[in-house]
């Protein structure tokens, strides 16, 4: 969104075409979230999270190759598909590393990290555009994601495999989790069971109502401020 004014000017993209680019990202993100969650369960948090982060890095960097709104829509759709794993993976890591009674504060800190990233990214993107080009903004973002993915692969370990934990710390984490998290062979819920679960709808419905506002602000506010109020 921070790059939208520059992209629209240099690639001659209309507001309607920009909306298609946003829709491509949002649709891919939405469809891929349950798929990404399944992949994370199959591959595990460490490998699954790293795989999606590398894909995000590749697709983000490849956005620099786009020469039209159609190319941008394809690239951003691919980014959305890879990014769909980030919140499920973060929550899964939180569930692995914190007992149930401390899960809320763990997720709170996870959200703080997401917010800090969202705060840092726009100035970084604008700096790259002003100092270099809009293509460089996507290349830098992709490179940083790749570095992070490598660091994740090196440093992240499940509590069972983390040698720096004492036995007491490890037992505190694992024994404080729900029963299904204590054994790797626990039976997973089916899609039907999830959809019949009232707790699922208690989470899903507020998100369904909140996401349109968040998505609109995130995608359109920078462009609105640029066109209506003349922000640079």
Task: Identify the role of each PLM range.
Residues 110-163:
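Helix-loop-helix hairpin linking two adjacent transmembrane segments in secondary transporters
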Residues 2-16, 219-232:
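Short amphipathic helix-loop junctions that connect adjacent transmembrane helices
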Residues 31-70:
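Conserved MFS/SLC helix-loop-helix module at the cytosolic interface between two early adjacent transmembrane helices
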Residues 12, 44, 65-71, 82, ...:
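Helix-breaking motifs and short loop linkers at transmembrane-helix boundaries and internal kinks
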Residues 197-232:
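Extracytoplasmic gate region of multi-pass secondary transporters
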Residues 26-34, 118-119:
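Residue-level signature of mid-helix packing/kink "hotspots" within the transmembrane helices
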Residues 75-114:
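Cytoplasmic helix-loop-helix junction between adjacent transmembrane helices
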């Amino acid at each position: 969104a921070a790059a939208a004014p520059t992209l629209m000017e240099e690639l001659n993209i209309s507001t309607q075409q920009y909306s298609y680019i946003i829709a491509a990202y949002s649709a891919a993100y939405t469809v891929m979230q349950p798929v990404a969650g399944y992949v994370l369960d199959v591959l595990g948090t460490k490998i699954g999270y790293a795989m999606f982060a590398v894909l995000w890095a590749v697709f983000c960097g490849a956005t620099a190759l786009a020469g039209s709104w159609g190319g941008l829509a394809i690239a951003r759709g691919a980014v959305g598909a890879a990014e769909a794993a980030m919140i499920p993976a973060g929550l899964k890591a939180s569930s692995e590393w914190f007992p149930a009674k401390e899960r809320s504060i763990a997720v709170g800190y996870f959200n703080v990290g997401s917010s800090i990233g969202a705060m840092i990214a726009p100035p970084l993107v604008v700096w790259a555009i002003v100092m270099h080009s809009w293509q460089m903004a996507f290349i830098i973002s992709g490179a940083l994601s790749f570095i992070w993915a490598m660091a994740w692969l090196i440093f992240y370990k499940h509590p069972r495999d983390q040698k720096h934990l004492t036995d007491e710390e490890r037992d505190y984490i694992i024994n404080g989790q729900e029963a299904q998290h204590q054994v790797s062979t626990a039976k997973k819920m089916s899609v039907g069971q999830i959809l019949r679960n009232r707790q699922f709808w208690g989470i899903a419905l507020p998100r369904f109502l909140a996401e349109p506002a968040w998505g609109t602000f995130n995608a359109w506010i920078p462009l609105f401020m640029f066109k209506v109020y003349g922000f640079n």
